Amino acid sequence: MKEIFSIEKVLNSRCSCDFDGNPKKDHWGIFIKDRHPSRRILERVLRCCKKTPQFSKGKLSLWFENEYLFLGFEKTNDPFKTRLLHIESGMQQEAVYLACTALGLGTCIHNLGINGTEYTDKIATARHLILEKANSYEAGKFSTAPPGPEKPFKKGKNLSEPKRNGNVECLPELEQLTLFKNTGTQADETDISQLLWAAKGRTPHYVKSHPWGLTIPTMGGGQNYTNVYLVKDNKLFRYINWTTRFLGGHARYARYARYLSWKIGYPTHDIKPLRNVNISDHLDGADIAIILSRNEKTNRALWEVGYMLENMFLQTKSLGISYKSKVFINDEIKKLERNGISEPVAALLL
């Protein structure tokens, strides 16, 4: 029977690669030097990248230079359109990662700065190196295992455990993602749990020598560029993917808490209740929404929002649910911030 490289398996197996030969040093995957994919295979990656769904009517760009695939967009004088294009370019970047993973290839973003780099009439947001890679896991290039064993996965109290394998082939669906789908079933609690994991869930690879693997790439191994919120039944929750144990009562440790919490916690999958809200008017009438926000005013945070949107659009394909999506405008951002959601950027509406 032919192996299915399912959406969930690809999300769980995605990782960055390098040449150092040590998966626990910097990046998890290992490139095979000078082993370039065939033009036919590379065209399949580019096809997924070119099919990125767009909120804007701007021009996304891709080009090759010195063996790197550059991604970006044509400049515009409209600040909101530029914001949209940064999000969409993040979706492009993630499309490259997912396509490479599904095809058994390795890739890594060699960054162009936290806000991108100007190239004449374009803004370049990333440059990807794409090569063949060695097996990333004991079972080969794919894994359906949870994080562990060094930092074992801790089941959350409020969400069902995510599936890390499925029956829907990833690559064909990656070529036909959309911003909305009017047909399909209403998302239930299991679907919501799966979407949260797809957005920013924990996976079994290492990042910067730590078991911090995620379904999305992170610049420099950073863990807190963005937040994920859930709105359901007029309640606001924050998605939690790492248990945090603060050293209470020891003020001298306070300045180290944000570093120590990653070292002493564990990967998890849960939501934390925050407050009651009444914000469906700002969510186009939706009663359930997954809201993506940024914790810093950089473009890398917008790209990360794009990664999460790309993953959730893909995950809906195997769930068979209806959904819409949106990027918030200034008035909506202010209203949502008054309801406890800091710097909201975009949402999946269910």
Regions flagged by a language model, labelled:
Residues F80-E88, T298-Y307:
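Short pre-catalytic strand/loop immediately N-terminal to key active-site residues, enriched for Gly-Thr
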Residues G106, S322:
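Residue-level detector of anion-binding/catalytic polar loops
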Residues L98-A102, K317:
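Short hydrophobic alpha-helices that are characteristic scaffold elements of the AMP-binding
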Residues I291, M308-N311, T316-S318, V327:
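Mixed-charge, glycine-accented linear interaction segment located at domain edges/termini
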Residues L42, L46-C49, S89-Y97, I192-K200, ...:
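Short, hydrophobic/amphipathic alpha-helical packing segments
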Residues M1-F80, L112-I123, Y137-I288, N299, ...:
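N-terminal amphipathic, basic helical "cap/leader" segment at the start of enzyme domains
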Residues D121-G140, V345-L350:
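C-terminal edge-of-domain segments
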